[in-house]
UniProtKB/Swiss-Prot annotation:
Sequence intervals crossing the membrane: none
Role according to the record: Catalyzes the conversion of (8S)-3',8-cyclo-7,8-dihydroguanosine 5'-triphosphate to cyclic pyranopterin monophosphate (cPMP).
Reaction(s) the record says it catalyses: (8S)-3',8-cyclo-7,8-dihydroguanosine 5'-triphosphate = cyclic pyranopterin phosphate + diphosphate
Top-level division of the source organism's lineage: Bacteria
Name this protein carries in UniProt: Cyclic pyranopterin monophosphate synthase
Enzyme Commission (EC) number: 4.6.1.17
Catalytic residues identified in the record: 129
UniProt record similarity statement: Belongs to the MoaC family.
Organism field: Saccharophagus degradans (strain 2-40 / ATCC 43961 / DSM 17024)
């Protein structure tokens, strides 16, 4: 059972994977989250009228910062020298939600999936924090990996 779970040793104990012998390759990962809210709250966000400030700029910076701190938050993640982190937030007015997409890149020995997922998650939590006075019913949903490239396991793309 543990042979496919790289974070478990032969005794079933959690450990950080040794990536020392792996080749350095270009690696990317893209993740997505949605933040669902009332139409009224979305209008306030879109107009830039949230009392706490610019929701988009604050969430974007929070997501970037979170990607850089991923190894401090998730115990078995390796500290990485990210070469690029982007966080894009778009309004989907027809669905009363924001779509948050994060992309992380590096030239390294391990992937950046957790960094992209963490960036999306923290950006979404930041939107919630900034808007909770307007709407207690905000829902963060469908956080998922959209794609990953590079590494021994190759490329992967989510399909709906």
């Amino acid at each position: 059972m543990t042979s496919n779970l790289t974070h478990l040793n032969e005794k079933g104990e959690a450990h950080m994977v040794d990536v020392g012998g792996k080749a350095v390759t270009k690696r990317t990962a893209r993740a997505r989250s949605y933040v669902n809210m009332t139409a009224e709250t979305l209008a306030v966000v879109a107009n830039g009228d949230v009392a706490k400030g610019d929701v988009f700029a604050t969430a974007r910076i929070a997501g970037i910062q979170a990607a850089k701190k991923c190894a401090d938050l998730i115990p078995l993640c390796h500290p990485l020298m990210l070469t690029r982190v982007t966080v894009d937030i778009t309004i989907e007015a027809n669905a009363n939600r924001l779509c948050i997409e994060a992309q992380c890149e590096l030239d390294g020995k391990t992937g950046v999936e957790m960094e992209a997922l963490t960036a999306c998650s923290v950006a979404a939590l930041t939107v919630y924090d900034m808007c909770k006075a307007l709407d207690k019913g905000i829902v963060i949903s469908d956080t998922r990996l959209i794609s990953k490239t590079g590494g021994k396991s190759g490329d992967w793309f989510y399909s709906e």
